Amino acid sequence: MNPIVSAASVVASGLSVGLAAIGPGIGQGTAAAQAVEGIARQPEAEGRIRGTLLLSLAFMESLTIYGLVVALALLFANPFTS
């Protein structure tokens, strides 16, 4: 295996996990803060807010999992090596 391709794959896999976690991390923090604020304003709507929050957190977390899958593909099933 070419050492340059191997090194680039390791760097790219690290970047894919890191960059894929930044956006969802910020989004999850914002969503949780807004959910807590909404529950504080309308305690009777807590069930609907919590359900919507959990669904949206799952969608946001899937983006991070996609980044992990790309990183694992670059590390173990690298299409750029022969």
From Swiss-Prot:
Pfam families: ATP-synt_C. GO terms for molecular function: lipid binding; proton-transporting ATP synthase activity, rotational mechanism. The chain crosses the membrane at residues 7-27, 57-77. Coiled coil: none annotated. It is a multi-pass membrane protein. Its main location: plastid. The record marks 61 as: Reversibly protonated during proton transport. The keyword Transmembrane applies. GO terms for cellular component: chloroplast thylakoid membrane; proton-transporting ATP synthase complex; proton-transporting two-sector ATPase complex, proton-transporting domain. It is found in: Plastid, Chloroplast thylakoid membrane. In plastids the F-type ATPase is also known as CF(1)CF(0). HAMAP family: ATP_synth_c_bact (MF_01396). PANTHER family: ATP SYNTHASE LIPID-BINDING PROTEIN, MITOCHONDRIAL (PTHR10031), ATPASE PROTEIN 9 (PTHR10031:SF0). F(1)F(0) ATP synthase produces ATP from ADP in the presence of a proton or sodium gradient. F-type ATPases consist of two structural domains, F(1) containing the extramembraneous catalytic core and F(0) containing the membrane proton channel, linked together by a central stalk and a peripheral stalk. During catalysis, ATP synthesis in the catalytic domain of F(1) is coupled via a rotary mechanism of the central stalk subunits to proton translocation. F-type ATPases have 2 components, F(1) - the catalytic core - and F(0) - the membrane proton channel. F(1) has five subunits: alpha(3), beta(3), gamma(1), delta(1), epsilon(1). F(0) has four main subunits: a(1), b(1), b'(1) and c(10-14). The alpha and beta chains form an alternating ring which encloses part of the gamma chain. F(1) is attached to F(0) by a central stalk formed by the gamma and epsilon chains, while a peripheral stalk is formed by the delta, b and b' chains. Belongs to the ATPase C chain family. This is ATP synthase subunit c, chloroplastic. It comes from Guillardia theta (Cryptophyte). The lineage of its organism: Eukaryota, Cryptophyceae, Pyrenomonadales, Geminigeraceae, Guillardia. The gene is atpH.
